[in-house]
Amino acid sequence: EMCIRDRCMSRAKSAFGDERVFVEKYIQGAQHVEFQVLGDGKNAIHFGERFCSIQRRHQKLVEEGPWLSDEKRQEIGALVCKGAESVGYKGLATFEFLRDANGDFYFLEVNPRVQVEHTVTELITGYNLVELGIRVAQGEDLPLSQSDITWRGHAIQCRLNAEDPKEFVPSPGRLWDCHFPSGFGIRCDTHAHPGYEMPGCFDSLLAKLLTWGHDREDAVRRMRTALDETQITGVQHLIPLHRRIMDEPDFLNRDITIQYIDNHQDLLG
């Protein structure tokens, strides 16, 4: 252990002229949980949590919510609102945490912006977060109180990246054809269309496919159908991976950590 520390200090000294290093606690069985917050510079409210532990290269692939008990949501929600109010935060923010196997939370960071997965929260609360963020940014006070926020059903989002589903290598090219599902409980946010040139030098996100259900099982069933109905021709994509995840026993049993993809290499095909 001392050897590793000394080596790290040596590298820090040579790279930055400062040998001080931070030692962080290893979180066993870590899960990624984040809270959506809106502040007006004086007060803050939260819109609950999103569960984002299915990741590749520390970037999210599947997000869903809600995930926590009502009691834990109330506890952590009060803390994040207090944090936002203490710095006079104005706008949308995401407070991100790691949760260990014992259920304890460890603060990671605040993302001071709207997140890709804000759509999950919109489906389960019924509020347009982008609109609320704009209204607050232009000087309005919070138009809602915490008691106005309730959660209904369950939502899941799959990121349909233009990537090789085995190695996650970007797959640029022309979309010769594409079709995205619609209907009750389905939302798809995308810029894709037949003839679109998917670039290789920017983020590989092609579409966000979401489903809402009365409970998690209902949302999963609807996501299976939505994935089956989605057609993308011309580039590789992650639909096969997402489809396998929706049937995987650990996923269905909520036995998910940030090592999920690493521990389920068979899902990559």
Where does each model-flagged region fall?
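ATP-dependent carboxylate activation and anion-phosphoryl transfer catalytic cores
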Residues: E1, R5-G269
